[in-house]
Swiss-Prot record:
Residue ranges annotated as motif Nose motif: 251-268
InterPro entries: Papain-like_cys_pep_sf, Pept_cys_AS, Peptidase_C1A, Peptidase_C1A_C, Peptidase_C1A_papain-like, Prot_inhib_I29
Cited function: Cysteine protease which cleaves native host hemoglobin and globin in the food vacuole during the asexual blood stage. Preferentially cleaves substrates which have an arginine at the P1 position and a leucine at the P2 position.
Ranges spanned by the short sequence motif Bipartite vacuolar targeting signal 2, renumbered to the chain: 84-105
A molecular function GO annotation: cysteine-type endopeptidase activity
Motif Bipartite vacuolar targeting signal 1 per UniProt: ranges: 16-25
Activity regulation statement: Inhibited by cysteine protease inhibitor ICP.
Observed phenotype of the null mutant: Lethal at the asexual blood stage.
Prosegment location in residue numbers: 1-242
CC terms in the record's Gene Ontology section: cytoplasmic vesicle membrane; extracellular space; food vacuole; lysosome
Protein name from the UniProt record: Falcipain-3
pH dependence: Optimum pH is 5.5.
Membrane topology, record value: Single-pass type II membrane protein
């Protein structure tokens, strides 16, 4: 390569110009320059793309966690993907902080010296709780025990969010899926601790190899055991003096009733019968935040009678009984028999459309809204040793059950957990079955008989709203005291 300087001898030299004269290797040099140019071009394009992403990410973030059916976004997949990177984790933390902070925006900050929140809950160590207001001090006060049990927390602290991201992430999804709203940030943190403890218990149970059922998180996740029992397990029963109480005018005799509906030559199949497979069960409903299990159990069994005897699907009003049953206590509990008595005295049930369910919202009894009434003539008490017979030939049975707070997170299988001390919940017995299962103690397959029970906690609870409880071939075994009170309504 030769290097030349060009200038005019008659002029003052102002600028030198460089001229490259290519020799034999000029082609390779040109290729090298072109490669450098391409690299620079790609780099510039990449930087431009990064800038474009930076200025548009806020807009994208707004729709990232939407729950719209139109955009088909899978929240679990997105969040799990984000958890794989540090930047993704930080993004989730920022969204959680935005969510938590929003609870304080509509409420004025408490002044210095406001009443301190001591959070008197299980798992909180009073000596570690320095009585720091969650509103006035949004730092520190976050600990997690070695067994992942949250003792106390501060959802405003980024370090806590990062250290407990999995649980906080699950809580965030729980809030979204169940549309949970809390009035204050203190309430939210209280619910987070309860949620964390419930989640821990669920995980510990599902690791067991000797249990026949599984648990799963659901809408009850932010309720303490005491709160769950007070809201959902408040059925009233006649107790041990049931047989000493005066006979109810609408109660029929079992032997007379079974003779009417059971064919003389019938042979009872004690292995399996499921009214869900024979058009005798209506859809699962949800009593929501109201202790109205007694109404759902009694109304559900009446719906089954209309389905079996009239061959038609009717959905009747539980809210009518909650509002108008003078012998029961609305959302604060009731008796199955009183529900049937008042059902008859009121002239029948309204349709669900005419008298819709509003849960725990206050309502005044208003029977004028009913366009048509659907009544029963009487009801019959089922003897302890006749459950399978009555179920097969009469239909689903309104029964009491001694449930415990372990029922709250039942997901599926054969429930073999703890039971309540006494009957406290009303459900519907809709069938029975048998399955061969492996017994680890004996090392062989054994026949396992069970009852199929319809609950009133929504179809997202249990096995589509149902739970399976152990019995025996004759149906005499009553797990969790099922059927201490058992009745079938009669249309004729």
């Amino acid at each position: 390569m030769e290097y030349h300087m060009e200038y005019s001898p008659n002029e003052v030299i102002k600028q030198e110009r460089e001229v490259f004269v290519g020799k034999e290797k000029s082609g390779s040099k040109f290729k090298r320059k072109r490669s450098i140019f391409i690299v620079l071009t790609v780099s510039i394009c990449f930087m431009f793309a990064l800038m474009l992403f930076y200025f548009t990410r806020n807009e994208n973030n707004k729709t990232l966690f939407t729950n719209s059916l139109s955009n088909n976004i899978n929240d679990d997949y997105i969040i799990n993907s984000l958890l794989k990177s540090e930047s993704g984790k930080k993004f989730i933390v920022s969204k959680l902080e935005e969510l938590i902070s929003s609870y304080d925006k509509e409420k004025k900050m408490r002044t210095t010296g406001a009443e301190e929140n001591n959070m008197n809950m299980n798992g909180i160590d009073d000596k570690d709780n320095k009585s720091v207001s969650f509103v006035n001090k949004k730092n520190g006060n976050l600990k997690v025990n070695n067994n992942n049990q949250v003792s106390y927390s501060n959802l405003f602290d980024t370090k806590f969010l990062m250290d407990n991201l999995e649980t906080v992430n699950l809580f965030y999804i729980f809030l979204k899926e169940n549309n949970k709203k809390y009035e204050t940030s203190e309430e939210m943190q209280k619910r987070f601790i309860i949620f964390s403890e419930n989640y821990r218990k669920i995980e510990l149970h599902n690791k067991k190899t000797n249990s026949l059922y599984k648990r799963g998180m659901n809408k009850f996740g932010d309720l303490s055991p005491e709160e769950f029992r007070s809201k959902y397990l408040n059925l009233k029963t006649h107790g041990p003096f049931k047989t000493l109480s005066p006979p109810v005018s609408y109660e029929a005799n079992y032997e007379d009733v079974i003779k009417k509906y059971k064919p003389a030559d019938a042979k009872l199949d004690r292995i399996a019968y499921d009214w869900r497979l024979h058009g005798g069960v209506t859809p699962v409903k949800d009593q929501a935040l109201c202790g109205s299990c007694w109404a759902f159990s009694s109304v559900g069994s009446v719906e089954s009678q209309y389905a079996i005897r009239k061959k038609a699907l009717f959905l009747f009003s539980e809210q009518e009984l909650v509002d108008c049953s003078v012998k029961n206590n609305g959302c604060y509990g009731g008796y199955i028999t009183n529900a049937f008595d008042d059902m008859i005295d009121l002239g029948g049930l309204c349709s669900q459309d005419d008298y819709p369910y509003v849960s725990n919202l206050p309502e005044t009894c208003n029977l004028k809204r009913c366009n048509e009434r659907y009544t029963i003539k009487s009801y019959v008490s089922i003897p302890d040793d006749k459950f399978k017979e009555a179920l097969r030939y009469l239909g689903p049975i309104s029964i009491s059950i001694a449930a415990s707070d372990d029922f709250a997170f039942y997901r599926g299988g054969f429930y073999d957990g703890e039971c309540g001390a006494a009957p406290n919940h009303a459900v519907i017995l809709v069938g029975y079955g048998m399955k061969d299962i492996y017994n680890e103690d004996t090392g062989r397959m054994e026949k396992f008989y069970y009852y199929i029970i319809k609950n009133s906690w929504g179809s997202d609870w249990g096995e589509g709203g149902y739970i399976n409880l152990e019995t025996d071939e004759n149906g005499y075994k009553k797990t969790c005291s099922i059927g201490t009170e058992a009745y079938v309504p009669l249309l004729e």
